[in-house]
């Protein structure tokens, strides 16, 4: 029965296997045989399942494997063909684009490195890449053309396509048709002459005046302009890398010791660098094209000087960049740096605008502190609001770039700023206060460019005007000592003297009491008032000097003392209040039970006496006296404690209340100090203390 049941499922499984459906097998009953009544252990079912499953797997493999193998082989062949066609097409495209047959620059050397430790290249697509040419004899960076090698300055799209294998999708299409520059003509070795297909530097091309820049839309808004025509050669060093050296010179124009605007590494012969006065403002060109405009990234050199980020720098006309010649002038215009050069100007005439990031010399780590400043070249018309990290909101006219007269600069700073230039043996330092206006004249160093010169031996002056009322002069020398500028004369700091309305009177200058033997205006003696005069009519057995008691008038009618005896017997509290002084002792005195009802003058004297004697010695005396009292009270309670009529809490409470009661009956000046006095007091007051303890025992005992 079981075998027939499983055999019934075989044809269905066979049909599924013949149909070639992968993953379709036998039924659940066939795959998972379970024992039944005839086959309790499932041995027969397992044997049948193993035999059947082996046949099915063999049939499936035989039908599927050939198809899978053929499919994989076809895909590999197709993929290989596509890769071959793609590689061939890309190589042909590169050859057609470069216009030469030979070693491909993108395959030999994908990136043109300008310097070993400097990288001016950014990612392709968004940020513009500065035009750089390396004219050294490197095989990967040269282009073979007509028997001689030429090299052209790559634009942003071409440079990104050479380095990354693809051109920028947003690039300018006109730049692709622009002619390339012949490198051999610049070196004087071009043999083709006018028939050369490459553009010579002296020739004029119609497509050279166009501007190519940042098409990726960066936030800085900086552009890179194409070099225009010029009849003279560009500035070159011994290696021939003209644009590279110009770029490095402009990068180091601001920051290298701030003495001149020349790069300290460039020490070669100087050639005249031609540049027109045109500049680019807000995406439009002026009448004259600009010869060299290079983008400045953020560069950090060894002297840790901040450079401008994303601003435009242009060169003036007939300017020479060397260590001994004329110096240039930097201006901020429309968010761009304008680079002006005049031969007759000296380093002191150079006008260097305030950078966006400056050092804060007040901090030891010399981090760059951004700040907001308002700079106005013309206080009546033109003003520019510079943000903390760059950018401009207004454009200034071109006439402010070439002015050599006095330029008025007003500052409204939000924080204290300062300069400190490193790398000199003489350094100048100054502080600019808030709301400080400065005026710099021609021939003097402006206020915000107090930088030292090696050959400077005279003083430079700058005038301050704070609030338009007071004026002072700042003299800055080139010595090694720092000079700090202060706006106006500072008034000395005066401490406010607090004057009280009531004159101060010492605590010991109290008025003399009536009956006192001390002269007037004498210091108060606490010992005089520590003992009150007796107010009882007669106490023959007590001395006057040892009595310090006062009985109020409202209680005199009940207990009237006559001739040392009482009409009525004293209460228990009154008996306890009487101390050993009642027997003629000179150490203690008798006080009444209602001592709190004394006159105000006596009470004040007692309080003052207690405050003056509340010191460490008094505390020690109290502790000794309390210790002896506690021991005496414990001896009195001990027989009752042994009988078992007192609990532990009741014993502690009786001892505590008894000692507190005795202490409350004594004044601080009546406390026995020595052990002999303490023993005498306890012996004399033993009956009173015993009665007090007995009263507390009767109250708290448990019968």
Curated annotation (Swiss-Prot):
Gene source species: Oryza sativa subsp. japonica (Rice)
Name used for this protein in its record: Zinc finger CCCH domain-containing protein 36
SMART domains named in the record: ZnF_C3H1
Keywords carried by this UniProt record: DNA-binding, Metal-binding, Zinc, Zinc-finger
PROSITE patterns cross-referenced by the UniProt entry: ZF_C3H1
Chain intervals with Low complexity compositional bias: 9-25, 470-481
InterPro entries for the chain: Zinc_finger_CCCH, Znf-CCCH_4, Znf_CCCH, Znf_CCCH_sf
Highest taxon above the source species: Eukaryota
Biased composition (Polar residues): 149-169
Molecular-function GO terms, alphabetical: DNA binding; zinc ion binding
A matching Pfam family: zf-CCCH_4
ZnF region ranges: C3H1-type: 176-203
Composition bias type Basic and acidic residues, residue spans: 112-125, 451-468
Region: Disordered, residue numbers: 1-42, 112-176, 204-242, 442-481
